[in-house]
Amino acid sequence: MTTAELTFRAATEADIPAVVELVESAYRGDASRAGWTTEADLLEGQRTDPEGVAAVVRHADGRLLLAEIAGETVACCQLEHRGDHVYFGMFAVRPKLQGGGFGKVVMAEAERTARAEWGAAEMRMTVIRQRADLIAWYERRGYRRTGRMTPFPYGDERFGIPQRADLEFELLVKTLD
């Protein structure tokens, strides 16, 4: 599989189970250790669930963007228009494809979509502050750290079961050309 084979489309309700499986495989449990984006050492439990994915699919001012190869979902990301910017989230690439340039291509398509669909001037995301490797990857793609932190939702198992007491999110931003 190569990045040249990727096609993109908006997710539908029928895609929800595949998206949940993809996101879980990229971030949680032993399957996630095949890639470099695992959060398995920071969080146990779920990363998302069908209800959470359905809310993204149904959001009137957003899109769950799927990247496919020959009809198989291999990556996804959430785009949510929020006034002057678009929020980027739920980013996942199949673990065995990570490191092969797929994430870079998906992110470029997400940024293109944010500009084309909503005229967004900025993309924003929140990343667990302790994920230095992931933050560095985003920085190489033009995102900058803001130093603005928000607390991790301890006690809400919809976001996972923390394995340490100091988790928090940092806001990253990028001006879209």
Where are these regions (language model features)?
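Conserved beta-strand in the GNAT
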Residues: 66, 72-80, 87-92
